[in-house]
Amino acid sequence: EDLSFISLGNRVVKTVKSDPNGKVVVTLYPGDKPGPVEIKATLVSNNTVSVLSKNVAVSTGRVTQNGLSLSASKNSLQDDKDGDTASITASMADRNGNPVPDGTTISFVAEGGSITPNCSTTKGICSVTLRTQNPRPLDNRVSVLAYVEGDKSFIDIDGDNVYTENVDTLNNNIGDFFRDDNEDNLYNASLGEFIYKRSAGKLACALSSIGQPNIADTCDNKLDAVLRKQMLFAFASDTPTFFGVSGVDQSMSKISNFTNFSFKVFGNSARQIPMPSGTTVSVSAKDNSEFKPVAQLISVAGVNGVPDTKNIVVSNAEPNTTIQVKLNDSYYFVNIAGNGTGTLTGQSKDLTGSPVVEYTNTACEAEIISGNLEVPGIMSLFTPASFKDVSADVAYSVKMKGCAVSDDIKIMITAPNKVTTRTITL
């Protein structure tokens, strides 16, 4: 209904002459609403002859604030070498969900490494490459900021598909912006954070966030803006940082029980990032213990020094187990302490014979029962302060079976360029 033709604003029938080749060329002026368009041409000399246009539609506009998104092939790169890369894809749509016009250009800046400065869209998307190299931020966390000319998101109160100032409502108004290198949602000039100033506005803005940095009180009520979107990346070491959580000490040198333990693996010593994407984690056990328990029947003297009971005593057994002892045609069960010995007291003084231990040495086994066996391509990096406590992508639990003193548990971290093992002897 808002399309015009031949001249801007015209919606009435017009007569147009053909060129020497018999062609009639008509200029169309799209309006503000998307949809199919049909143009009818009728021969003046014979109005029974007419034709309708085909495959004409109004479909694209400028990228809108909530139509800009970023994705990445991975977000934890190898910091120990130059040249590890991640592909970052910008997807852009207008407020009606249509891809923006081909050739829309979006720019990128990065806190660390190097990044392709811009890309131009085809069918609403384009991609750039983030590459590890100097500079390398000390906290191994890299902010990447993308920005593009577009329109703010708004609620179309009057339903005309056009933003009308003081009638329609802007969603999450945005003004000037910055690259939030230290992730505190504030612009810090002393850190040399990248800043983009264009607005002369003084109105309040939406709160700044990691995904959409915003400088307070730089907004206006206009529709056009420089849209922005920020992502976080980790530049992670191939050398893991271990941290014991439960069932093992924090330094991962001693396991306190023989069943389960849990730990975390980080990509830097500050425990603020995961290992590089694609790193694998495995666990194995080595059985170094071979127990040969022996049982004895020992008399116990009463108050008068005369034996009145007997004990079944087991030694050289596997700690913290229960041993089955056969004596004559009966079976007795002896609980073994941590030192490998156990005593079953209070047996009859008339009990005789040679007790025999029925025991099979069990092999030590270990398996990861929770945690990523391969570090994912995409993970939440949370905040520098909270990552070590809340990230599930760095947490692992191990179940042990049949393990005893002197057995070894080996954790193997296979990063893209390095293999690290941590062996814990029980």
Predicted regions, residues:
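The feature marks long extracellular or luminal low-complexity segments
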Residues: 1-426
